[in-house]
Structures are given as C-alpha cells and as structure tokens.
Regions:
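Small/aliphatic-rich secondary-structure junction motif
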Residues: 3-51, 73, 77
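A short acidic, glycine-rich active-site loop
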Residues: 52-65
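Short glycine/serine/threonine/alanine-rich loop segments
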Residues: 31-32, 79, 103, 134
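Gly/Ser-rich helix-loop-strand patches that form or flank binding pockets
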Residues: 96-140
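Structural beta-alpha unit
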Residues: 72-106
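Conserved beta-strand positions in the Rossmann-like core of class I SAM-dependent methyltransferases
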Residues: 34, 82, 137
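Histidine-centered beta-alpha loop that forms part of the nucleotide-sugar donor binding/catalytic region
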Residues: 10, 88, 110-113
Length: 140
C-alpha cells in the first residue's frame, strides 16, 4: 500500500510525533522513508567559505544536527530511510520531492519550528495537503 513514505520534519515536537507515526507505518508495511528537511535560507557566506563551498555537505550536517532524534528512531529500529535536504519554500519543496521520489504518502506535523518557524495547519501543512498528488497524514 504505502511503500514510499515521505516524512517532512524540522525537529519540533510535532515533527517527532510524525516521525514516530511514519516509523510505525514503515515497520508494519516494510516501507522506505524519505526524511525531508527544508532550510528556508541558505548558509551564510562565511560558513560556506569554511566548508570550502561544499554547500550540500554543510546543509546535510545542519539537517542531521536538527533532526538527530528522528534519525535515531529510524537507525535504532533498522528502518530503511534516505535523507533529503533542500533550500526554499517548505511546502513547494516537500511537494516537489514527493513527486520526484514518487511518494505514496506524505507524513507531516501540524506545526513546527526551526527552519519551518511558524508552521501552522493553515500554512505549510495545508498547502502540502492541497497540492500533493498523494495522500497526506497530518500528525498533531
């Protein structure tokens, strides 16, 4: 049924609950989960210089730090996952990655913080639900 699950996360408490739901589904259905972390603003020039302009590695490092709890859930349980990090509008990036990865289900928290500051059901979650081409599970 759901073999490819996309989990949009930002490390917030609601995102952690969404991660637990996604992990439970992945375990029960033997699904692969794509963890998606969206950064709204690119790293500063000084950070990019320090990272030798390896922006992808810098973004991945930031993401792993912010969503360590989520990654730990998947690694501890031995669940298959991939981490995708993008810069831009959270809703648009989540939808784009879901389409590219051919996700069967998107799991997202109802509100968050961090790079998704001020995410309320009326914004990112609603946009994702409205525009996604697959079912969306919003976790409170």
């Amino acid at each position: 049924m759901y073999t490819k699950i996309l989990l949009a996360t930002d490390g917030s408490e609601n995102a952690r609950r969404a991660a637990n739901e996604a992990a439970g589904l992945a375990r029960e259905l033997s699904s692969h989960v794509t963890l998606v972390y969206i950064i709204q603003h690119p790293p500063s020039q000084s950070r990019m210089v320090k990272a030798n302009f390896d922006v992808h590695s810098l973004l991945e490092e930031d993401a792993k730090s912010e969503i360590k709890h989520t990654i730990d859930i998947f690694e501890t349980e031995g669940l298959a996952y991939t981490l995708k990090v993008a810069i831009g509008d959270p809703a648009a990036e989540i939808i784009g990655i879901a389409e590219k990865e051919k996700a069967d289900l998107i799991v997202i928290g109802s509100r968050g913080f961090g790079t998704l500051k001020g995410v309320f059901l009326g914004s990112v979650s609603q946009k994702v639900t409205y525009h996604a081409k697959c079912p969306v599970m919003i976790v409170k």
